[in-house]
Amino acid sequence: MLRFLNRCSRGRGAWLLLAFTALALELTALYFQHVMLLKPCVLCIYQRSALWGVFAAGIVGAIAPSSLLRYPAIALWIYSSYEGIRLAWKHTDILLNPSPFTTCDFFVSFPSWLPLDKWLPAIFNATGDCSERQWSFLSMEMPQWLLGIFAAYLLIAVLVLIAQPFRSKRRDLFSR
């Protein structure tokens, strides 16, 4: 399995599949926001940012998958997945254990050098409350689904990182 993951990480298709899945989740979030009129909260916006990090990792990895550029892509993939898990866990905790002392911020706080909420307010502007239950599917809220998705991303990313030293075997049918 590790040799297979190594081979996949050296091909462009797997990286583009990673980027496609993250983009599909982003488009789903925008559908929920603009078509179903669900209001995203601050933690939802941060989780979207983590998904954009996974998307960026897929694009960086697809640029030159056979070179050493895949290592920064794997690092970005692991970091974004970990942050997504951390944020989804915090959001799930706020939803499942409501408390007046555990709340999220009122406004998104991006770095001053990257004010995404000012540049793209249709995507990164938070208008909802983190403790409000807006959507559920199969008795799970959206942050719980994202917790599972980010955990799957992280598991696969760690396995791909572990697989990097395992080269695929050369198959020489006519040698001894």
UniProtKB/Swiss-Prot annotation:
One of its GO terms (cellular component) is plasma membrane. The keyword rRNA processing does not apply. The chain crosses the membrane at residues 15-31, 50-65, 72-89, 145-163. Gene3D superfamilies: DsbB-like. Disulfide bonds join 41-44, 104-130. Its main location: membrane. It is found in: Cell inner membrane. One of its GO terms (biological process) is protein folding. Residues 32-49, 90-144 are periplasmic. It is a multi-pass membrane protein. The keyword Membrane applies. Required for disulfide bond formation in some periplasmic proteins. Acts by oxidizing the DsbA protein. Belongs to the DsbB family. This is Disulfide bond formation protein B. The lineage of its organism: Bacteria, Pseudomonadati, Pseudomonadota, Gammaproteobacteria, Enterobacterales.
